């Protein structure tokens, strides 16, 4: 059965094991998620559990949103997402970090930091040209391709908007869970800026 929870990225820190090993970790605050809806094949065509995270003021919600969360007897939520392959949950039930334990392998999804409009060197890792005064090529994208097609092929590495993409990092290890603070520590870094939404769920490609 899949485990899943929504949280916010707090930042990175480091911890030491009893043997003195240094481990960089990302701190994710995951206050209790509330089950807003349980979808079934009969009613929705597929099975999933819809959960809400992070309360927001009622004045920021419209009537349909208020009516939807009222069924779960909770406040309007800023983030609403779905998890599949989760069973045994009912509307209004809370999901906490206690379902995870140290050693679990998870997939973490977040939105990467937006970098704005960037050149080919930063965006695609291309090599720059000589920086000498006589050089006529420093940080340009390079050749656009052969003359014959009379066009630039799709996929050519050019300058453009960088970042702000939804990215999933797979097979990260849960180092520690602190239920009293609603905090989970995950080994390494995860995509996203501080305070951004993070989705944690059981790894789909974990070694068995």
UniProtKB/Swiss-Prot annotation:
MF (Gene Ontology): rRNA binding; structural constituent of ribosome
Entry's Gene Ontology BP terms: translation
Signal peptide as annotated in the record: none
Alphabetical UniProt keywords: Ribonucleoprotein, Ribosomal protein, RNA-binding, rRNA-binding
One Pfam family, short name: Ribosomal_L3
Region (Disordered): 116-146
InterPro entries, sorted: Ribosomal_uL3 (IPR000597), Ribosomal_uL3_bac/org-type (IPR019927), Ribosomal_uL3_CS (IPR019926), Transl_B-barrel_sf (IPR009000)
Single GO cellular component term: cytosolic large ribosomal subunit
Family as reported in the entry's similarity comment: Belongs to the universal ribosomal protein uL3 family.
Subunit structure, as described in the record: Part of the 50S ribosomal subunit. Forms a cluster with proteins L14 and L19.
Role, per record: One of the primary rRNA binding proteins, it binds directly near the 3'-end of the 23S rRNA, where it nucleates assembly of the 50S subunit.
Name this protein carries in UniProt: Large ribosomal subunit protein uL3
Organism in which the protein naturally occurs: Streptococcus mutans serotype c (strain ATCC 700610 / UA159)
């Amino acid at each position: 059965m899949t485990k899943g929870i929504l949280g916010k990225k707090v930042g990175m820190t480091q911890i030491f094991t009893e043997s003195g090993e240094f481990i960089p970790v990302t701190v994710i605050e995951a206050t209790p998620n509330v089950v807003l809806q349980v979808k079934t094949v009969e009613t929705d065509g597929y099975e999933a559990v819809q959960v809400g995270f992070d309360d927001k003021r009622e004045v920021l919600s419209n009537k349909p949103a208020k009516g939807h969360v009222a069924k779960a007897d909770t406040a309007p939520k800023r983030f609403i997402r779905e998890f599949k392959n989760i069973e045994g949950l009912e509307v209004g039930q809370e999901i906490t970090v206690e379902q995870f334990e140290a050693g679990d392998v998870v997939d973490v999804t977040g939105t990467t930091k937006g970098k704005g409009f960037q050149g080919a060197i930063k965006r695609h890792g291309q090599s720059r040209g000589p920086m000498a005064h006589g050089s006529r090529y420093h940080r340009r994208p390079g050749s656009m391709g052969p003359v014959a097609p009379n066009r630039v092929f799709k996929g050519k590495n050019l300058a453009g908007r960088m970042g702000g993409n939804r990215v999933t990092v797979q097979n990260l290890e849960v180092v520690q869970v602190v239920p009293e603070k609603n905090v989970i520590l995950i080994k390494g870094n995860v995509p996203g800026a501080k305070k951004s939404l993070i989705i944690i769920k059981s790894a789909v490609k974990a070694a068995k």
